[in-house]
């Protein structure tokens, strides 16, 4: 399939019309998107060859290019993003087939269900941008700081996310916004003792990490589970402890060590009021896939050569000559960096040897597109929310947290009136993980149908409400699932556009310890060496972390191995470069053709759309 095939993709960031309130500078065009692929590579040498355009690889390419390194960046796919891609539904269908054929390393058990197929379930594939590894970005984070420093933020749009819901006692609640003194002391559902305990704990979390009392307390409790620490030290128990640990801290399991949990909770708290009254943002039109593309554009302006639909077929470590599937040969002066999904066949044994001593971790994902915008779960003027199911909160007795990111049409990932539910779990037993995800989906389905029902007026009673500080009656929880609604059966059913799930393997620990801590770097494949050459390096698969934490740390590990130091990582005065940058961006232009429609039923197969021949999806 030609790489420059506009029928299979959504409009790129350079082609789409930005929001009225957002006026980006000239966005440079990118090979394989606005500019067609060259038939063969037009260079005879480069310093660094990078295989795969995932988020880590794209940031690495830009960081090297802006230091004057000649980078050749290729991808065997005909789209950008690799394992961090943002894909249309048709692309996802083909991706699932490739996964199950064993063509996509580190992914398995991909299943997709389109109720009724496209004959009765009408939709335009290109109206959807679905992330393979969805992420949220904290307002106070190293990735966001780099986006601003590198000027890549100019190519992106971000939206606030302030609603975090936690599921407990068969109810959805959103009390975790109670993270300020004002909120805590005006919350009538909390006792005075609990309010004081919360304030004491939040004050402790926000203390400087170098405070001697805080350091000693964390050291004394370094191996103590956070639940035990909250109870013994601050007198906090469930439900407040659950909200702190799993919604604010976004921990993925119970028994998280106290220092890690406190750091996670602080991440949330210090992100408030950085850009507004919210802690988290999401990138519009897609997550890691959009950001990957942004860094690729930056790298291209700095001189990186790009080519999609191209594979490395051979590399001579003595002559340092790389041969590619398009017939071209290029001398690689320094290093080759390969993403796990892009490792060529001749390096498969080397990759296996490099990773054989590493512990694999699985993350199981279930993504569902529904014809309901779920505005009931979101703050006014926002288009995203997070739902968390703590351990033991589901009928399946989930041992790990189920985390769900919800985005509706306002985020540009689907049509208006619809939403995408991204759920995942770190449960290592795949069958158990699938049951947990299905159970969480059913709870959310029942909740949104109840929430959006129009005949609720006579079902609520006084105990479903509390009075806020202004004297206004308010529902006890965000989803209106008071006790009197537990037996309410909505008349409608949830209309599903598409539902698909898959299992991903990574060598990044769910707690990110082998990425964030230099003492555990030996357990990271970025530090592994190939037996017959020092010139080949591997990057990691995306982690199970819901945020972008750990990404920059991993990029810096690779950058340091290549250059010898990470002190000059993105050490560029972009303010002085802005004029030159804008001229370079403006000079890259191409004629943008109108996209033609896809034949909706061209590859419809009811058996493959309904796994195991079932009428409903079984994950």
Question: Can you annotate each of these PLM segments?
Answer:
Residues 52-55:
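Glycine-rich Rossmann-fold phosphate-binding loop(s) that bind the pyrophosphate
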Residues 61, 65:
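Gly/Ala-rich phosphate-binding loop of Rossmann-like dinucleotide-binding domains
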Residues 155-159, 301-312:
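A conserved beta-strand/loop element that lines the FAD pocket in flavoprotein oxidoreductases
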Residues 279-283, 293-302, 311-453:
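Mid-domain catalytic core of redox enzymes
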């Amino acid at each position: 399939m030609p790489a420059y095939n506009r029928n299979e993709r959504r409009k790129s960031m350079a082609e789409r019309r930005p929001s009225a309130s957002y006026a980006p500078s000239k966005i440079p065009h990118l090979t394989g998107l606005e500019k067609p692929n060259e038939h063969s590579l037009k260079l005879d040498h480069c310093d660094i060859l990078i295989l795969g355009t995932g988020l880590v690889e794209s940031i690495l390419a830009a960081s090297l290019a802006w230091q004057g390194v000649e980078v050749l960046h290729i991808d065997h796919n005909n789209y950008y993003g690799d394992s961090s891609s943002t894909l249309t539904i048709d692309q996802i269908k083909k991706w699932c087939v490739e996964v199950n054929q064993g063509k996509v390393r580190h992914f398995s058990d991909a299943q997709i269900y389109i109720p009724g197929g496209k004959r009765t379930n009408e939709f335009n594939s290109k109206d959807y941008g679905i992330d393979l590894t969805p992420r949220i970005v904290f307002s106070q984070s190293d990735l966001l700081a780099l986006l601003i420093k590198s000027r890549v933020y100019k190519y992106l749009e971000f939206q606030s996310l302030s609603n975090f819901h936690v599921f407990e006692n068969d109810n959805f609640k959103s009390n975790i916004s109670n993270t300020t003194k004002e909120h805590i002391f005006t919350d009538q559902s909390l006792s005075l003792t609990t309010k004081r305990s919360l304030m004491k704990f939040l004050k402790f979390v926000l203390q400087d990490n170098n405070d001697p009392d805080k350091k000693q307390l964390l050291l004394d409790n370094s191996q103590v589970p956070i639940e035990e620490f909250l109870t013994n030290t601050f007198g906090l128990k469930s439900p407040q402890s659950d909200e702190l640990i799993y919604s604010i801290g976004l921990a993925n399991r119970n028994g998280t060590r106290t220092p890690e949990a406190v750091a996670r909770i602080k991440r949330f708290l210090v992100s408030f009021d950085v850009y507004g009254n919210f802690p988290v943002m999401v990138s519009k039109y897609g997550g890691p896939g959009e950001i990957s593309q942004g860094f690729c554009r930056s790298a291209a302006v700095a001189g990186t050569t790009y080519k999609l639909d191209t594979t490395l077929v051979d590399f001579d470590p003595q002559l340092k000559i790389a041969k590619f599937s398009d017939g071209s040969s290029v001398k690689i002066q320094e290093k080759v960096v390969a993403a796990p999904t892009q490792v060529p066949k001749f390096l498969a044994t080397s990759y296996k040897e490099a990773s054989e001593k590493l512990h694999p971790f699985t993350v199981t994902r279930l993504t569902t597109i529904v014809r309901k915008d779920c505005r009931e779960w979101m703050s006014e003027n926002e288009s995203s929310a997070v739902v968390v199911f703590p351990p033991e909160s589901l009928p399946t007795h989930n041992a790990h947290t189920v985390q769900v990111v919800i985005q509706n049409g306002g985020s540009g990932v689907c049509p208006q009136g619809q939403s995408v539910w991204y759920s995942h779990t770190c449960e290592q037993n795949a069958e158990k993980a699938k049951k947990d995800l299905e159970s969480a989906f059913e709870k959310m389905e029942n909740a949104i149908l109840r929430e959006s029902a129009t005949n609720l007026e006579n079902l609520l009673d006084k105990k479903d409400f509390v009075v806020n500080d202004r004297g206004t009656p308010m529902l006890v929880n965000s989803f209106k699932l008071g006790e009197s609604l537990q037996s309410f059966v909505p008349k409608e059913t949830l209309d599903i556009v598409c539902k698909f799930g898959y299992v991903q393997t990574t060598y990044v620990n769910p707690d990110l310890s082998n990425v964030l801590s230099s003492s555990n770097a030996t357990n990271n494949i970025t530090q592994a060496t190939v037996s017959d050459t020092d010139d080949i390096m591997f990057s990691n698969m995306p982690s199970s972390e819901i945020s972008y934490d750990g990404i920059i740390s991993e990029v810096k590990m690779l950058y340091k191995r290549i250059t010898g130091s990470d002190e000059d990582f993105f050490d560029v005065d972009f303010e002085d470069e802005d004029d030159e940058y804008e001229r370079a961006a403006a000079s890259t232009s191409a004629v943008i053709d109108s996209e033609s429609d896809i034949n909706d039923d061209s590859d419809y197969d009811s058996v493959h759309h309904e796994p195991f021949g079932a009428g409903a999806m079984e994950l």
